[in-house]
Amino acid sequence: MQKLFIVLLLFCILRLDAEVDGRRATFCKQPGCQEACKKENKNGRCVDKFDNNFSYNICRCY
């Protein structure tokens, strides 16, 4: 049971702050993005944004 807890904890930490060649990646979840944009009567989509050495995956409403 303790091993399972440690594995889940590490999975959550790595998922929230992934390091790839010095770039931090943030994760956008499509269902959550669509729900947030529905309030504005728009369609939501996860898109990649690049800023200096960082790459972000963010939600955009169209």
Swiss-Prot record:
> Protein name, please?
Potassium channel toxin alpha-KTx Tx773
Tell me which UniProt keywords the record has, alphabetically: Disulfide bond, Ion channel impairing toxin, Neurotoxin, Potassium channel impairing toxin, Secreted, Signal, Toxin
| Similarity annotation | Belongs to the short scorpion toxin superfamily. Potassium channel inhibitor family. Alpha-KTx 23 subfamily.
Q: What does this protein do?
A: May block potassium channels.
- Cysteine pairs forming cystine bridges in this chain are C28-C46, C33-C59, C37-C61
Q: Which domain of life is it from?
A: Eukaryota
Q: Where is this site: Aromatic residue of the functional dyad?
A: Y62
Q: May I ask which residue range the UniProt record assigns to the signal sequence?
A: 1-18
Q: Where is this site: Basic residue of the functional dyad?
A: R45
A single Gene Ontology MF term assigned here is: potassium channel regulator activity
Residue stretches in coiled coil: none
Q: A Gene Ontology CC term for this entry?
A: extracellular region
Q: Which species is this UniProt entry from? A: Buthus israelis (Israeli scorpion)
- What is recorded about the protein's domains? Has the structural arrangement of an alpha-helix connected to antiparallel beta-sheets by disulfide bonds (CS-alpha/beta).
